Amino acid sequence: MKKDIHPEYHIIDVKMTDGTVIQMRSTWGAEGDQLSLDIDPSVHPAWTGGTSRLLDTGGRVSKFKKKYEGLGF
């Protein structure tokens, strides 16, 4: 393998939607940073068998619905 071309691999904290924090190795962020998830396997419809829910982060879903409300979707 070539040296000095791969990203640093370190331990980060991952905060699940229920507040649980787990440690895992990742190339994301820096050592000790915390990654907060909007959706995780405990609430994702693909894993729970439930219906999907829309996350309106930043108002993008609302903006889309308002823009195309006259088309009858």
UniProtKB/Swiss-Prot annotation:
UniProt keywords, alphabetically: Ribonucleoprotein, Ribosomal protein, RNA-binding, rRNA-binding
PROSITE patterns xrefs: RIBOSOMAL_L31 (PS01143)
One GO process term, biological-process aspect: translation
Molecular function, one GO term: structural constituent of ribosome
Pfam families in alphabetical order: Ribosomal_L31
GO cellular component terms, semicolon-separated: ribonucleoprotein complex; ribosome
Domain of life, per lineage: Bacteria
SUPFAM superfamilies per record: L28p-like
UniProt cross-references to InterPro entries, sorted A to Z: Ribosomal_bL28/bL31-like_sf, Ribosomal_bL31, Ribosomal_bL31_A, Ribosomal_bL31_sf
Subunit-structure text: Part of the 50S ribosomal subunit.
HAMAP family: Ribosomal_bL31_1
Function in brief: Binds the 23S rRNA.
UniProt family annotation: Belongs to the bacterial ribosomal protein bL31 family. Type A subfamily.
Name of this protein: Large ribosomal subunit protein bL31
Native organism: Dinoroseobacter shibae (strain DSM 16493 / NCIMB 14021 / DFL 12)
